[in-house]
Amino acid sequence: PIKKFIELHGLNRAKVAFKKTYPTDGNWKLTLDNFHECYHCLPAHPEYCHVHSKDYIQAYGAGNNTGPESIEFNKKLSLWNKKTEKLGYLTGEYSDSNFSNFFRSAERTPFDGDRLSETKDGKPGSILMGKFKEFDGGYTTVGTSPFNSFIMSNDFATIFTFIPRGPLKTDVEIMWLVHEDAEEGKDYDLNKLIWMWDKTTIADKKIIENNQKGVMSKKYVPGPLSEMEI
């Protein structure tokens, strides 16, 4: 069910532009919990919030379909779906049931305004990939398991792998993929490509490590993630 979302981006004709590992002093469960919820994004991740709309972030909440219903975002999504389908590109979403052993999910989501890519200025970060002949103003998110995620603009893909290294250590590995014919310095600027997720993951590393210190404390008392938490 998620294959068609990945095939849209032509990863079979991609190459690794950059790879970085973020060693994190935190349990794998804390690390994954942090990655899969977005209540902390607005106060903690200015770079991510610069790229992604507030309506989407609040609607995402602590994971797909856990946040409050966003009428404004649903309007944007409906209009974008119609426009994108006219271009002949895939839209929609998929999610395993809550009792699935796989935790698979996929969705296509619009950016705000005239943004085309997950770059700071919203302009293309590289040449188009896969089946795209022109930019559709959206991106694709795919989860193949709790430990692996793909976040793909039309022009580059960011692949996340979470690797437990011990009870209190987790490696967060990120690969940035571009079209196999793309040339660094000509078709893409590496710093522009990695900007958002590099900044965001460095901030997440600190958050996770602080959470781990709290969990290890005898005085730790868990609380809600947000006043919006349902």
Task: Identify what each model region corresponds to.
Residues 1-230:
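C-terminal catalytic domain of Rieske-type non-heme iron oxygenases
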